[in-house]
Structure formats: C-alpha cells, structure tokens
Amino acid sequence: MKFTIMSKGDQSSDALASTMKEYLLDFGFIMDEQEPDIVISVGGDGTLLYAFHRYYNRLDETAFVGVHTGHLGFYADWLPTEVEKLVIAIAKTPFQVVEYPLLEVIIRYVNGSKESQYLAMNEATVKSAEGTLVTEVEIRGEYFETFRGDGLCISTPSGSTAYNKALGGAIIHPSIEAIQIAEMASINNRVFRTVGSPLVLPKHHTCVLKPTAGMNLQITVDHLTMVHQDVKSIQYRVANEKVRFVRFRPFPFWKRVRDSFVADK
C-alpha cells in the first residue's frame, strides 16, 4: 500500500510525521506523494483541508486520516499519543471508509472565457471586493430573491460546524447529502428583502448567483481566497465526488459536536 504524510510544519507535527513514516516503511509500505492510497494529515483540520485540495483529483483512489497535534478536530480522531496504535491499525487492520459530501462550485464569466471549477470540503463564500454584495439568487432555475449584504456562505454538512455555524446556520450530519446557504449581514428593510434564514438544499438542487455586472468578487473555497472579475454566475450544488476518510474505530459526529461546543473542557 502507498502512503504519504502531510504535516502542519511545526516542530511537533514534523517529528510525529517523521516517526510515522519510519514505522510505515518498516511495515513494508511505500512512500508515494503522487498517487497515495492513504494520506495521513498531521496537524489540525486546516492541514487536512490542504491535503484534500492537494489530492482532489484522485478522491476515488485516496482516503484520508488525521492526527491532531492541537485540540481534537472534526476531521481527525487520532492524538499524538496514539501514533503507534494508528500505524499498527493501518498495517494490520482492514479499514473501513466513510464518505462525506462535497460542494461543487462553478464560476462562469461574462466574456465567455473558460469556467472555473472547484470542490470545497467545508464551505465557499462570496463577497464584493468593494462593498455591498448585490446578486440575484436562483434555486432550481427559478428566481428566488435579490440578496444585498456582506456576502453568502455555502457549506457542506461537515463544514456546517465551521463558518456556517457562526452565521447562525444549522449543524447537518454528514450522512445527509445537502448544501446550506447562510447570509452574512443581509440588508432588510421596506425596500430590500431577503428570506433572512439559512436554506438547506438537497442533492440535485442547484443554487446559482448572478451578481451585478461589473462587480469584483472575493470568492473563497475552504482556505483558498481569490478575486474574480467579470463574473456572470456562480453555481453551487452537491458534488458528484465525495471525500473518503479511513476509520479504524467509531468516531460519532454528534459526540464531536458535543465535545467541541457543549462539553466542559
């Protein structure tokens, strides 16, 4: 089996990554940064996001597992003290794979140039680079509303605990194939009106934003931030692709939610 390890880059993460590499090589595994079967992330959830975007083009062949060198995260269930146990599990145990839905983002341009396409594991956001975002919102090909405000956040179920939650969005279990649209400081008065509530769209339902002509947009996809000009539309939907996580033991989603937001530290 082929593996690679991506480290956060700090001293403790690099040391753990080096130790795991030596152990796995001793077990006869092959280090392969180009076409790994397993990607081991050592750091935090941000490190695993980087790993996902590094290997987004081979999601059917690659599975991810995370070791947290900080506090326990939503994408990693292994602690630094459990590294030897994890290595033995990888080497000796047939692993199960859990699949999480992803968000597909397609940006189309006024001048007809080639569209830009992205996958998000957590969320994608859109804001005006200059001020208030003004955009038509279409759902399933029908006009829904004209949004005016700071921006919009479109999240996956696994990303619903991140920026989406801070915006008042619902937490959605990753077994549900859906995306969620949450508003950022919408303008609502007697003249301008939005639904003012997060929207949950099931698979096969598409949301298309059509921003005001000439507006420069700041668009994020997970940790990536870009400025796009001459945008005709931005399309969001549940992606056909899924991210796969290696599981050697139960890792209940609602326990993670409780430990992160409710339980005493």
Curated annotation (Swiss-Prot):
SUPFAM superfamilies linked: NAD kinase/diacylglycerol kinase-like (SSF111331)
Record key words, sorted: ATP-binding, Cytoplasm, Kinase, NAD, NADP, Nucleotide-binding, Transferase
Main location: cytoplasm
One example of a Gene Ontology biological process annotation: NAD metabolic process
Cofactor(s) the protein requires to work: a divalent metal cation
Annotated binding of NAD(+), by residue: D45, G46, N122, E123, R148, D150, A185
Enzyme class: transferase
Reactions performed catalytically: NAD(+) + ATP = ADP + NADP(+) + H(+)
GO MF term set: ATP binding; metal ion binding; NAD binding; NAD+ kinase activity
Pfam families listed in its UniProt record: NAD_kinase, NAD_kinase_C
GO terms for cellular component: cytoplasm
Places the protein is found: Cytoplasm
Gene3D superfamilies: Probable inorganic polyphosphate/atp-NAD kinase, domain 1 (3.40.50.10330), Probable inorganic polyphosphate/atp-NAD kinase, domain 2 (2.60.200.30)
Database matches in PANTHER family: NAD KINASE
Family statement drawn from the similarity comment of this UniProt entry: Belongs to the NAD kinase family.
HAMAP family per the UniProt record, alphabetical: NAD_kinase
Biological role: Involved in the regulation of the intracellular balance of NAD and NADP, and is a key enzyme in the biosynthesis of NADP. Catalyzes specifically the phosphorylation on 2'-hydroxyl of the adenosine moiety of NAD to yield NADP.
Protein name: NAD kinase 1
Upper lineage: Bacteria, Bacillati, Bacillota, Bacilli, Bacillales
Gene, per the UniProt record: nadK1
